[in-house]
Amino acid sequence: PGADAGLGVLAKLKIESSYSFGYLKFEGLSFVDAKDPARNKMFIEDFFINSSFFNDQLVIRAGYQIFNWSDLEVFHPADVVNSIDYDSDLESLDKKGELTLSMEYPILSGELTLFLWPKVEKSIYPSENSRLGLGTEIADPNWVIDNQVISKQWNNQFGILVNQSIFKGDYKFHYIKHIDRK
């Protein structure tokens, strides 16, 4: 008790490839801690196929994706789509990929993107022995939808994103109906 010691190995695997039917991307993360097996984890960050149709006018992407709603990769109030690994680097928490179906179509001087998220990934919380933990095991998350507490991961959620370049500025407008992972 009171000692904070750890010995861990973090590995990331990234594979990207183009095919006649589209673009495939896989990115996964694995962490093994020799002193605290409760911290061992493996999860998908990105694993999707990206295909274009109608002379590249319609882009459909399906699979697990990480979203960064901020172009600068800094804190952003709307950056709530992905579940988080709270037992990772505090300055840049790892995100878990979310199962996604998206369709992107060009409009005016930008794009309109529709998102469907059928499943909520569970965030990873620090173990009771972690330096970031509370000294007790944190239970699996529950979510509140329409004033009802639920624990099922399969819940339909959606989002709309409009990107536009107007004059010399880039603008993003979005609407998200989802379960907040934070």
What would you call each of these model-derived segments?
Residues 2-5, 119-122, 157, 161, ...:
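Outer-membrane beta-barrel biogenesis signature
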Residues 4-10, 39-42, 92-96, 151-155:
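Transmembrane beta-barrel outer-membrane domains
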Residues 11-17:
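Histidine-anchored nucleotide/phosphate-binding helix
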Residues 12, 98-100, 157-159:
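Short hydrophobic/aromatic beta-strand or adjacent loop that forms the aromatic wall/cage
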Residues 10, 104, 115, 163, ...:
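Residues in well-ordered beta-strands of folded domains
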Residues 17-132, 167:
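Outer membrane beta-barrel
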Residues 3-5, 16, 37, 87-91, ...:
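Outer-membrane beta-barrel proteins
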Residues 133-182:
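Surface-exposed beta-loop-beta
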